[in-house]
Structure formats: structure tokens, C-alpha cells
Amino acid sequence: MIDFKSIIGKVATGATLTRDEATAAFDAMMSGEATPSQMGALLMGLRVRGETVDEIAGAVSAMRAKMLTVTAPPDAVDVVGTGGDGSGSVNVSTCAAFIVAGCGAPVAKHGNRALSSRSGAADVLAALGVKIDITPDQVGRCIAEAGIGFMFAPTHHPAMKNVGPTRVELATRTIFNMLGPLSNPAGVKRQMVGVFSRQWVQPLAQVLKNLGSEAVWVVHGSDGLDEITISGPTFVAALKDGEITTFEITPEDAGLPRAPAESLKGGDAEANAAALKGVLQGKPSPYRDVALLNAGATLIVAGRAGDLKEAVALGAQSIDSGAAAARLAKLIAVSNTAE
């Protein structure tokens, strides 16, 4: 058993933890072996100093070791945002997930209810009629039969109940805001991850590389969006063939028009569900464009397209042929017929 006090003492001096120390510390927290004050001290110490790649990788390893896993094809992909960007935008990655699935790439989407916005992935999917509180085996069946499955974080990460109250009391962003998107229960090795701050774009790509991911885009919009934005440039760190490159992309790179960030403002779960349905029905809008851009990046990560223009054209075909909407209909049907 780890000496948690010595870990806090180390962080208090400004020293960094090794990956193994971080794994042990977060294992203790999620096992209920650390007291609330010890957890709060460590989380705030890391936040104030700034978490390192090794510390995040160690924490993710601890979280992955405790999660309830889902069986998915080896080429499955996730498209997910950290949330916490304060934008109150429509559900971009959720909409993108159906577009990607409509292109034939298996999607193992991981998400939760809203933390800071009015509608998280789980909220909007539930409003659409998807059953979200299903077992890991049932999620696997959704991926196999519908080409897409949704893994509701609390179901797959039961050990998080031990840190939940401390997180609520701290009421500020901690390392845990980054761990969820990096701890996909289907063990996907291809990820499109949006983050709430530019400072984390390159480090999180490095974390995923260190943890064995094969193809990754980590993105942050210049307007603060934890997705690829259509209001301006987006900062990207891409992992491909073991190498990480950083670059910027714009909507024009994909042949899409710009639109102000305000055009992506969302509402509650019902309003966002209606907007998502509108996109899948083929209605032109800035929401369609931003969903296509994020789906396009995910298709590149999935190995289905070589560049953004090609990827966005594939995504548009997925919508306009009805394939994306068919994936949603199938997910609703399969998730509600639990065996």
C-alpha cells in the first residue's frame, strides 16, 4: 500500500511524480484508501503546479485498470471532448460520431452527463431515445449491430464514486477532467480528443502515444471550443506512425465556410437533440459544418480518408444518403432491446 502522505509531501515541494507513483496514488484514491482531504490536497497540488505527461499517463493507467471493459473491433474509434470549455455549444462530437459510423467506421463513444454545460453526450442521447444505462456486454452488442455504441462513464468507471464527492467539493477543474476522455472502456487505439485549453493539446497527444494509441488528433479551437471550430483556426497535435506533429487547420482547409462561435450555441438536452436530428436529416447550418469538420478529422484518424477535404466529402455523403441517421435509429433500437 502506498504512503499517500509522502506523495503529498513530494508534490508540496513542487517535485513531480513518476508514472508509477502517479498510478499508485490514483489507484489508492479510486480504491477508497485515501481520505477526502488527502485527495483534495493532491488534486490541487497537481493543478497549481501543472500536471506532467508522466503523471497524467500514470493516472490514466490506474483508471483503465479499474474500468469495466467493452468488446469492440480493433479499428474502433472514439470522438470525445473534455468538456469544461464554458461554450455551452451544441453536441458536436456526438453528432460527428453518427456521421463517422455512417461511413462504416465502428465508433465506441465514451461520455457522461453535462458537467459545466446544459447538455452532455449522455443527456442528448437519452433525449434522442438511446438507452444509456446498459451493461458493457450490451454496449458491445450495439457496436457490433449498429456500428456505434455509447459507454456511459459512471457505468464503466464505478471506482470514480470514491473521488466524486471530493471533486464536487473542490468545484474546480482537476486532472480528472482529462482522464475520462483518455480512458475509453473499449480500449480504442484511434481517438479524436478535444481539450478545453491549448496548453494540453501536445501533452495529451504524448500521453496517448505513451499509452499505446496508434492514431490520434488532439484539438483545441482558437475560440476556446473543445472541438475543431468553424469560427477560426484550430490547434492540432496528431499522432501517426509513432510521430507527433503539431499544426493549425481552418474550415477553409476542408472547403467549409466560417461562422461565428455564437452560431453554435446550444440549449438543453431536448433542444440539442432536435438540432442534432436536423443535421442528420440534411439541414444546412453551421452545426452541420462543425459536425462535418470534426467527423472528417475522426475519419482521418480512423484511416478512412487521407485529408480533410476528402474526409468531409465522405461525411456529407454519410448524412445526405441517410446512413448517419440510420446508425442513430439502429442504436436506439438495439440499446432498447437489452437481452
UniProtKB/Swiss-Prot annotation:
Annotated binding of Mg(2+) 2, by residue: D226, E227
Binding site for Mg(2+) 1: S93, E227
Enzyme class per UniProt: transferase
Binding positions (5-phospho-alpha-D-ribose 1-diphosphate): 81, 84-85, 89, 91-94, 109-117, 121
Cofactor dependency: Mg(2+)
Cofactor note: Binds 2 magnesium ions per monomer.
UniProt EC number: 2.4.2.18
InterPro entries: Anthranilate_Pribosyl_Tfrase (IPR005940), Glycosyl_Trfase_fam3 (IPR000312), Glycosyl_Trfase_fam3_N_dom (IPR017459), Glycosyl_Trfase_fam3_N_dom_sf (IPR036320), Nuc_phospho_transferase (IPR035902)
Alphabetical keyword list: Amino-acid biosynthesis, Aromatic amino acid biosynthesis, Glycosyltransferase, Magnesium, Metal-binding, Transferase, Tryptophan biosynthesis
A GO CC term attached to the entry: cytosol
Binding site for anthranilate 2: R167
Pathway membership, UniProt: Amino-acid biosynthesis; L-tryptophan biosynthesis; L-tryptophan from chorismate: step 2/5
Disulphides: none
Catalytic reaction list: N-(5-phospho-beta-D-ribosyl)anthranilate + diphosphate = 5-phospho-alpha-D-ribose 1-diphosphate + anthranilate
GO molecular function: anthranilate phosphoribosyltransferase activity; magnesium ion binding
Gene3D superfamilies, alphabetized: Nucleoside phosphorylase/phosphoribosyltransferase catalytic domain, Transferase, Pyrimidine Nucleoside Phosphorylase, Chain C
Residues that, per the record, bind anthranilate 1: G81, N112
Subunit structure and binding partners: Homodimer.
Functional summary from the UniProt entry: Catalyzes the transfer of the phosphoribosyl group of 5-phosphorylribose-1-pyrophosphate (PRPP) to anthranilate to yield N-(5'-phosphoribosyl)-anthranilate (PRA).
Family the entry assigns: Belongs to the anthranilate phosphoribosyltransferase family.
NCBIfam families: trpD
HAMAP family: TrpD (MF_00211)
Name of the protein this chain belongs to: Anthranilate phosphoribosyltransferase
Record organism: Rhodopseudomonas palustris (strain BisA53)
